[in-house]
Design a protein with these regions (language model features):
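A short alpha-helical cap/connector motif
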Residues: 1-135, 142-155, 159, 165-242
């Protein structure tokens, strides 16, 4: 079993690193990326999650040009609402969107760690969209507030996903839900996912064992080549759950 796990992780890493190299070459050549601005292990994780969940009504805090990439994985009747607070970035994203199933919303709000969740117009913008959501992605500003108010906007069997869950300040907020999982790698300020729901069985959403093998191997390799193991600064792979 150990040999099989090692083989699986090695094959996954080869795939991730190959795609990462192509992305860097294309960036050097000035080509506009079409894949999400995530590490490829995160793209595969997130893609499998959406494919299995098949949400119809989606809400995203923090818009991105990668939204059409993920929309292709959803049902034909899926609608994706994206909330953005930066006018210039809003214009950039809007200019590249062609699907009438993606709805971009500009909200006058700023990052404010002292803003209370109940009065946060950014976190509570979902009230203006009416109805509940099958899926909510938190990847913008005031993330703690967005997590704290998410439950009142989630439909039955709805799922909350928090990107950059390597940031420990999000963990206590994610853990307020009945069911939660947090997968982390070697990074401290970016990457990682937190999943939460009061209804869903999170075990069935992705192949946790397989992804854990690959994420752990990637973390070990990164810590080694950055010599973090010598100075005690290496951050280990971690998968926590409720």
């Amino acid at each position: 079993m150990k040999k099989e796990m090692t083989t699986f992780a090695a094959m996954s890493l080869m795939r991730y690193y190959r795609k990462g190299t192509v992305r860097k070459i294309n960036k050097w050549l000035g080509k506009q990326p079409t894949d999400p601005y995530m590490k490829f292990k995160e793209i595969e994780f997130f893609s499998e999650l959406l494919t299995n969940l098949q949400p119809v009504r989606c809400l995203e805090y923090g818009s991105g040009i990668s939204t059409p990439f993920f929309l292709k994985l959803l049902p034909d009747n899926a609608q994706w609402h994206s909330v953005e607070n930066l006018p210039k970035w809003y214009d950039i994203v809007k200019a590249q969107l062609t699907s009438d199933r993606i709805h971009l919303h500009l909200v006058d709000a700023k990052e404010d760690p002292n803003q209370e969740a109940a009065t946060d117009v950014y976190a509570n913008f979902a009230e203006q969209l009416e109805g509940e959501f099958d899926f909510i992605l938190v990847d913008g500003i005031n993330r703690e507030n967005c997590i704290d108010v998410a439950d009142k906007y989630l439909a039955k069997n709805g799922l909350l996903v928090v990107h950059d869950a390597n940031r420990v300040q999000y963990h206590s907020h994610i853990k307020q839900f009945k069911n939660w999982k947090i997968i982390q790698d070697f990074r401290k300020t970016a990457g990682g996912f937190g999943l939460a729901s009061n209804d869903l069985d999170l075990e069935k959403l992705v192949s946790w064992n397989e992804h854990s093998q690959a994420w752990k191997a990637d973390t070990n390799i990164s810590n080694f080549f950055k010599f973090k193991f010598l100075i005690g600064g290496g951050k280990p792979f971690k998968l926590e759950h409720s």
